[in-house]
Amino acid sequence: MAAASFYGTGKRKSSIARVWLKPGTGVITVNHKTLDEYFGRETSKMVVKQPLELTENMGKFDIYVTVCGGGDSGQAGAIKHGITKALLEVDAALRGTLKKAGFVTRDSRIKERKKYGKKAARASFQFSKR
């Protein structure tokens, strides 16, 4: 029996996205809003759609997403990662294409912590010799 929906979890920076794909018309819903309502920037919308355009699945699935944490860029990246993982659940043959584009690998770069005795992670306070 084939599954009615496909699930994938995506992460980027401090954002976590849970993505469900269902066969449908191509409607993308993020936190109960349309993609256009949720993301103001065109680049964020483009990032979210990249795995679908690459695998030629645009308009074949209705996508429901819940995402939390981080900012716009991190959330868009997390959704992209989640959609990629859900597409792999749909068809494992897409793995080569998605891996080549670098969508399967989790981007592990996160914010470096602030150190004590310093202004930021690496920036020090101004130093005066005399």
Swiss-Prot record:
UniProt record, GO biological process: translation
GO terms for MF: RNA binding; structural constituent of ribosome
InterPro entries registered for this protein in UniProt: Ribosomal_Su5_D2-typ_SF (IPR020568), Ribosomal_uS9 (IPR000754), Ribosomal_uS9_bac/plastid (IPR023035), Ribosomal_uS9_CS (IPR020574), Ribsml_uS5_D2-typ_fold_subgr (IPR014721)
Keyword Ribonucleoprotein recorded: yes
Keywords on record: Ribonucleoprotein, Ribosomal protein
Gene Ontology CC, one term: cytosolic small ribosomal subunit
Entry keyword annotation includes Ribonucleoprotein: yes
Similarity annotation: Belongs to the universal ribosomal protein uS9 family.
Cross-referenced HAMAP family: Ribosomal_uS9_B
UniProt name for this protein: Small ribosomal subunit protein uS9
Organism: Geotalea uraniireducens (strain Rf4) (Geobacter uraniireducens)
